[in-house]
Amino acid sequence: MAPQEDPEDHVAPAAQRVRAGTLLLANTDLLEPTFRRSVIYIVEHNDGGTLGVVLNRPSETAVHNVLPQWAKLAAKPKTMFIGGPVKRDAALCLATLRVGADPGGVSGLRHVAGRIVMVDLDADPDLIAPLVEGVRIFAGYSGWTIGQLEGEIERDDWIVLSALPSDVLVPPRADLWGRTLRRQPWPLSLLATHPIDVSRN
């Protein structure tokens, strides 16, 4: 049976400000290797600062080699992703809930935004499995202190956009950076044509 569709998977409203569930896309002038063409999903944004994970930086480390109990639920390519430069020795897990799934009463899940939840890696994967389309596990995260991210946005380092529930589990070959820009209105969508190798421009 085909999976039930969610209208949110096709249309993301424009993001007016940074909040949990929004995306930060590296602008074309942000050439620092850690964040170049990165797409960051914001997990927390509050008075304590901002925390997010890079969605498009897969590592070569298989989930099975680090957290074997979660390997079955891990979305393809079933590798750990580099969430950012902070605490690379710590793991953080996000999941996309199935359409209509009710996580109420299930320990180990914390709502982030829409159908995205944070998963406690000490939870029982067998209890989580019926509720989610898959999980993505990140080594480390990206963090900003109070006001730091706002300054970077004012400097045009980042573009703030709304996320689709499917963005969290997109495989690396899909070019999430370009795909996210292409679904934006003109002229923002034109940035998707920016060459990966700027020396070719």
Swiss-Prot record:
It comes from the Bacteria. InterPro entries: AlgH-like (IPR003774). One of its GO terms (cellular component) is cytosol. Belongs to the UPF0301 (AlgH) family. This is UPF0301 protein MMAR_0053.
